Amino acid sequence: MDNNLIGARATVYGLFASLYMNGGIERDYEAIIKVLSAISSEPFTDEAKEFSDLMIDRLQNDKNGVLYEFEVLFNLPFGDFINSSASYYHDEREFGEKTISTKEIMHDAGYIKADFYSSGEDEFGMLCAVSSKLLIEQKTILQKKLFDIVLKPTVAGFVDAQLKSERAEFYKSTASLLALFIAFEKSYFEFYG
């Protein structure tokens, strides 16, 4: 397999990890802009360019608004709250089967979640971070397993929740880009197995 393609996939997973983890946008702002700019310059679909351009514009012109939107959508457990646990979209509860599957894959990779990280292992930001790390460390079989068992069956519910949210603006573009990337990943695994 092409190492450049694997590296690009790891980078895009890292982008989504930063966008869906608490503090990720503030911590990784420059890298987020850089990756979105790269996607805009060399999009994997025409729509990817459109969504990455919208995201760059919003981040550069209203970063505080994006941070507020993240808090409202993913951290305030009332109103337009969007659950970011894969188990929620599978078992209709947090810390379910997908949490166990993710813990098993992380164990097989030799990863231990830090105690100071309060979110579950199956939160979409964490799933993207683990996917990125697995690809960087060339643990592609485990990354495919994580994709097949946890991400692929649950991500549509997470994306739909963002697209249907009346309070999401930036995260509608983010969810759309995530959906395009997941479609790319499905095709990638069909081609490379």
Language-model features: locations:
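Surface/interface-facing alpha-helical segments and adjacent flexible terminal/loop regions used
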Residues: 1-193
